[in-house]
């Protein structure tokens, strides 16, 4: 594997949240990292949904469907995260760096009814805001779903210390 001779640190991303020590050890054997390489495992964690406009948290009203709206490189990951909240999830995905248009909003609005909410990424919320399009979706139905990287096996402090060490040497 190409990284064996180049990387000081290897991060295995998007692991299952409940990765077992046995699975970790098997993966470490399979990648054959050098002893001098530090290997970390991470997963994606869902933050608390908040309204696109303002920092208000999600309304407690019931909803039956989620629209997962994204213009990112790997929309399947975002849809999977949305499906953790509701199995009734429709994905409206666009290419990475997509510039949203009025036609896109027409498509979104055609799928929106009273018991549907829209989740989008933090990146897309910024783009939709800049393009002035996000005002077309009712604010009580439009939320940012923050996704954060979380290190597994309580390795975050070890990772932070290693980065500081690498920067200072």
Model-assigned labels for residue ranges:
Residues 95-99, 138-169:
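Short, flexible loop segments at boundaries between secondary-structure elements
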Residues 10-22, 42-49, 69-74, 95-99, ...:
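G-domain G4 guanine-recognition motif of GTPases
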Residues 1-34:
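Phosphate/Mg2+-binding loops and adjacent switch elements
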Residues 99-116, 123-126:
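A short, acidic, amphipathic alpha-helical segment used as a generic capping/interface helix at domain edges
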Residues 22-33, 82-83, 129-139:
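Short, aromatic/basic amphipathic alpha-helical patches
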Residues 52-55, 61-104, 164-166:
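Redox- and metal-dependent alpha/beta enzyme cores, enriched for Fe-S-associated oxidoreductases
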Residues 1-6, 32-34, 60-62, 112-113, ...:
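Short, conserved loop/helix-junction motifs that constitute active-site signature segments
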